[in-house]
Curated annotation (Swiss-Prot):
May help in the organization of the PsaE and PsaF subunits. Belongs to the PsaJ family. GO terms for biological process: photosynthesis. The gene is psaJ. The chain crosses the membrane at residues 17-37. Keywords: Membrane, Photosynthesis, Photosystem I, Thylakoid, Transmembrane, Transmembrane helix. It comes from Acaryochloris marina (strain MBIC 11017). InterPro entries: PSI_PsaJ, PSI_PsaJ_sf. Gene3D superfamilies: Single helix bin. GO terms for cellular component: photosystem I; plasma membrane-derived thylakoid membrane. It is a single-pass membrane protein. It is found in: Cellular thylakoid membrane. SUPFAM superfamilies: Subunit IX of photosystem I reaction centre, PsaJ. This is Photosystem I reaction center subunit IX.
C-alpha cells in the first residue's frame, strides 16, 4: 500500500468554519440572553447586589 498524501483544502475549510461558527455563536448568545432574561423575571434583583 502506498502512502496517499493528505490533501488539505484550506479555502473549503475556511468557508465551512465561517458558515458554522457564527451560527453556533448566535445560538449560544441567544440562549444565554434568554436564560438571563427569564432568571431576572422569576428572581428580580438577583443580578444586583446592594451594598
Amino acid at each position: 500500500m502506498g502512502d496517499v498524501p493528505l490533501k488539505i483544502d484550506s479555502e473549503k475549510d475556511f468557508m465551512k468554519f465561517f458558515s458554522t461558527a457564527p451560527v453556533i455563536a448566535l445560538v449560544f448568545f441567544t440562549l444565554t440572553a434568554g436564560f438571563l432574561v427569564e432568571l431576572n423575571r422569576f428572581f428580580p434583583d438577583i443580578l444586583f447586589f446592594p451594598y
